[in-house]
């Protein structure tokens, strides 16, 4: 399936680190559309963040299009600096008669990461590691704490239950958002980040974040000659606590 799970999880979420106190997380509900070169239709999805009655946070994303459906959910708490510390993560993917589910359990006391469902395994857990969703909120916090200067490189570590992935994002600066905004106003200013891949890689990924609240406005990911584009279409009411 061209719209792979790995691509989809990149939608939904530092040489400058996550030091000091992080910006406060505010519940939200955002609506998105996605297009992929070679497919004659768009997918639609949501991203939402809520704070539960037990004080923990729940970050959810959904994406669906005809024969494809993907759901992700991350449960996390905040560490002493106010940065997300993942506890549980689950993803479910179904389409073309196939189903797949993966669960991650982060045991910080024992420093152990357990993956069940798809390709079960256990690995040591390194402090500061994020799940496939919570890293996006940690990056958003870093931006809201103070917009970094042009060419600043933001680093973080993410795991989907396999070997950790070191992600590096270069700040390209403030630019006009391609195309009209959800309100139909062209030229909205956004902070643009580009992911740095290994030298020689043809893979490209660019993120546009709203200057006002750090919302993800647009994502472009080109891999193997095809472009995946995801854009914000509307903001809704935040989920109730």
Q: Where does each model-flagged region fall?
A:
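N-terminal secretory signal peptides that target proteins for export/translocation
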Residues: 1-3
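Bacterial N-terminal signal peptides
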Residues: 6-16
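Hydrophobic, well-structured mid-protein blocks that either form specific transmembrane helices
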Residues: 99-145
């Amino acid at each position: 399936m061209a719209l792979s799970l790995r691509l989809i999880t990149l939608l939904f979420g530092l040489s400058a680190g996550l030091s000091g106190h992080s910006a406060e997380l505010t519940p939200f509900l955002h609506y998105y559309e996605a297009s992929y070169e070679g497919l004659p239709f768009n997918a639609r999805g949501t991203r939402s963040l809520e704070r539960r009655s037990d004080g923990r946070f729940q970050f959810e994303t959904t994406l669906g299009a005809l024969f494809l459906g993907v759901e992700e959910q991350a449960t996390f708490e905040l560490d002493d600096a106010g940065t997300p510390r993942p506890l549980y993560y689950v993803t479910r993917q179904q389409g073309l008669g196939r189903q797949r589910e993966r669960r991650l359990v982060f045991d910080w006391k024992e420093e152990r990461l357990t993956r069940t469902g798809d390709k079960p395994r256990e690995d040591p857990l390194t402090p500061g590691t994020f799940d496939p969703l919570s890293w996006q909120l940690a990056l958003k916090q870093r931006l809201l704490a103070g917009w970094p200067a042009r060419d600043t490189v933001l680093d973080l570590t993410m795991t989907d239950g396999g070997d950790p992935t070191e992600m590096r994002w270069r700040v390209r600066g403030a630019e006009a958002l391609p195309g009209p905004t959800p309100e139909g106003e062209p030229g909205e200013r956004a902070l643009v980040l580009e992911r740095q891949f290994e030298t020689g890689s043809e893979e490209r990924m660019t993120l546009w974040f709203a200057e006002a609240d750090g919302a993800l406005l647009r994502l472009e990911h080109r891999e193997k000659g095809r472009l995946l584009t995801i854009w914000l279409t509307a903001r809704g009411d935040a989920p109730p606590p």
